[in-house]
């Protein structure tokens, strides 16, 4: 009787053990996934993926590309959180998308902060709109430029900005905001400086090659003036950290020096005429520039060269116009040109034949 009772007990034990083994045996994943293929998720899930797709398809050439991308990603993450919480009850999906949503919102806030309208002081607005805005300098970068190591100073009429052979050129760089200044050399009037023009751009360019120099001209306020002044040393360090702004300054200073050379040719040039200057120089300006270069390069004394240039420019209107070669300094050796015969010209092998352009 005991043997008959033990047989069903053994059978039940084996059956229980096999059922446990079956429960531990892994089920092929294809069976469960294929069964889930027929399930269609809620509409919120699909709208979230549409938001992701639209955000990734925004062209990078669009001005607000990054802002629109972050908006669409944030909207998609929000819909994912709603879908995982209300329709799927998936805690892990909700947590991950909440993290992604927070990251996108932080980045979106930073982008909107950078795009905020930057307020430029009214007194500096003219300088920005005339000099820096046409060169696509952002307002925030201009504000950084004018907000550090920079101050606005005032000069009354008759006060001196710089004195020749006394004032150092290594201290500052300035832009005239209001008024008018007069530049002279040894009592000779050279030109005027008008608003939105650099006051000491030639000196700034010269100090990049030679340090410790003095002003060679005297600059006096011809009216009540206000000007924007940078510390030369700190401005140089700042421009080294901003390559784009460094190139902008190189261009603006070079253009300002060119305008001052135009003013040397016509001292009566006013601010309105300066705005209308043509890119190409007139014949009179070319002659004046040639005289100045020849005078400076041919004279051992800078003062004699300037006097020669001033006398030549003042008498240009009264004297008959001659060729640039005739007005060259006597110390400069003229270019020797071969005399051509009617038929042909023979030139020695060591000689250089120069043809004069019409």
Curated annotation (Swiss-Prot):
Domain of life: Eukaryota
Quaternary structure, from the entry: Homodimer. Homodimerization requires the C-terminus cytoplasmic region. Interacts (via the C-terminus cytoplasmic tail) with TJP1. Interacts (via the C-terminus cytoplasmic tail) with ARHGEF25/GEFT (via the DH domain). Interacts (via the C-terminus cytoplasmic tail) with VAMP3. Interacts with KCNK2; the interaction enhances KCNK2 surface expression and is inhibited by cAMP. Interacts with CAV3.
Name of the protein in question: Popeye domain-containing protein 1
Gene: Popdc1
Subcellular location: Lateral cell membrane; Cell junction, Tight junction; Membrane; Cell membrane, Sarcolemma
Lineage per the UniProt record: Eukaryota, Metazoa, Chordata, Craniata, Vertebrata
Keywords: cAMP, cAMP-binding, Cell adhesion, Cell junction, Cell membrane, Developmental protein, Glycoprotein, Membrane, Nucleotide-binding, Phosphoprotein, Tight junction, Transmembrane, Transmembrane helix
UniProt keyword Chaperone, yes or no: no
Membrane is among the record's keywords: yes
């Amino acid at each position: 009787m005991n043997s008959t009772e033990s047989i069903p007990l053994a059978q039940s034990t084996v059956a229980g053990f096999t059922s446990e083994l079956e429960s531990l045996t892994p089920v092929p994943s294809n069976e469960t996934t294929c069964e889930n293929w027929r399930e269609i998720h809620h509409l919120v899930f699909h709208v979230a993926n549409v938001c992701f797709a639209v955000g990734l398809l925004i062209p990078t050439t669009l001005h607000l590309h990054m802002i629109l991308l972050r908006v669409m990603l944030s909207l998609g993450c929000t819909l994912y959180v709603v879908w995982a919480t209300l329709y799927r009850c998936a805690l892990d999906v909700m947590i991950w998308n909440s993290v992604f949503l927070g990251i996108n919102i932080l980045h979106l806030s930073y982008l909107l902060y950078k795009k905020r309208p930057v307020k430029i002081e009214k007194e500096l607005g003219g300088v920005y709109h005339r000099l820096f805005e046409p060169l696509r300098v952002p307002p925030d970068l201009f504000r950084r430029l004018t907000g550090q190591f920079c101050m606005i100073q005032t000069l009354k009429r008759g006060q001196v900005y710089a004195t020749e052979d006394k004032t150092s050129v290594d201290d500052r760089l300035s832009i005239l905001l209001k008024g008018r200044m007069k530049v002279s050399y040894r009592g000779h009037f050279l030109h005027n400086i008008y608003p939105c023009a650099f006051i000491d751009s030639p000196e700034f360019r010269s100090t990049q090659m030679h340090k410790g120099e003095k002003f060679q001209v005297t600059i006096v306020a011809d009216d009540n003036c206000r000007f924007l002044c940078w510390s030369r040393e700190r401005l140089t360090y700042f421009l080294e950290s901003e390559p784009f702004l460094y190139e902008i300054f190189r261009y603006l200073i070079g253009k300002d020096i060119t305008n001052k050379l135009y003013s040397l040719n016509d001292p009566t040039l006013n601010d309105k005429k300066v705005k209308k200057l043509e890119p190409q120089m007139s014949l009179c300006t070319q002659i004046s520039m040639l005289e100045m270069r020849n005078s400076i390069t041919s004279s051992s004394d800078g003062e004699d060269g300037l006097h020669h240039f001033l006398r030549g420019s003042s008498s240009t209107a009264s004297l008959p116009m001659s060729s640039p070669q005739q007005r060259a300094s006597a110390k400069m050796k003229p270019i020797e040109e071969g005399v051509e015969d009617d038929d042909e010209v023979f030139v020695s092998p060591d000689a250089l034949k120069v043809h004069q352009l019409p």
